[in-house]
Amino acid sequence: GLFLNTVKDVAKDVAKDVAGKLLESLKCKITGCKP
C-alpha cells in the first residue's frame, strides 16, 4: 500500500545519505581531508 511505499522511499533516502557520508569519510581517510 501507500504506507509501505513511503517507508521504502524514506529508507532509500536514508541509505543514500548514509552511503554518501561513509564515502566522504573514506575519501578523507585515503586522501587526508583538509577542511
UniProtKB/Swiss-Prot annotation:
Keywords: Amphibian defense peptide, Antibiotic, Antimicrobial, Disulfide bond, Fungicide, Secreted. It is found in: Secreted. The lineage of its organism: Eukaryota, Metazoa, Chordata, Craniata, Vertebrata. Antibacterial activity against Gram-positive bacterium S.aureus. Shows no detectable hemolytic activity towards human erythrocytes. Expressed by the skin glands. Belongs to the frog skin active peptide (FSAP) family. Ranatuerin subfamily. One of its GO terms (biological process) is killing of cells of another organism. Disulfide bonds join C28-C33. This is Ranatuerin-2SPb. One of its GO terms (cellular component) is extracellular region. It holds the Pfam family Antimicrobial_2.
